[in-house]
């Protein structure tokens, strides 16, 4: 069971995502960028769904804070369909994006794909570490 942090200030969207994901995953909720960073810093998060426009710290500030510590999957949520802005978030380290209003099947599929890809990378990273020389 993956732990998914949903950072979204709209309580209706939070509830929709919690209902969608909670059957197969543990969902942790944050309603501002500042709260999202705090919950992320508590550890154990496997994936982040991150709104772009948030009170406190906005989505790009939260993304930068996460990328300073981790490479876990981050999927941006946006009501904006500005391709240039979306491209910039992808270049800044987001793994994917979903435009609101979203299709629930698409959200579930994108979350599943990102979690699967993340799980596939972990054994390779462990293997790389094990192959390092013991005495540096």
Where are these regions (language model features)?
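Short amphipathic alpha-helix used as the core "switch/output" element in two-component signaling
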Residues: 38, 60-72
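C-terminal output helix
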Residues: 84, 102-115
């Amino acid at each position: 069971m993956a732990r998914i942090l949903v950072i979204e200030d709209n309580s209706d969207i939070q509830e929709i995502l919690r209902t969608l994901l909670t059957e197969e995953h543990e969902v942790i909720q944050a309603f501002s960028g500042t709260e999202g960073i705090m919950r992320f810093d508590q550890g154990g998060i496997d994936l982040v769904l991150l709104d772009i426009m948030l009170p406190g710290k906005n989505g790009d500030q939260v993304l930068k804070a996460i990328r300073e510590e981790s490479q876990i999957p981050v999927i941006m949520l946006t009501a904006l369909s500005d391709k240039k802005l979306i491209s910039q978030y992808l270049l800044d380290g987001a793994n994917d994006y979903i435009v609101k209003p979203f299709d629930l099947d698409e959200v579930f599929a994108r979350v599943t794909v990102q979690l699967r890809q993340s799980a596939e990378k972990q054994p390779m990273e462990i293997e790389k570490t094990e192959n390092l020389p013991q005495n540096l």
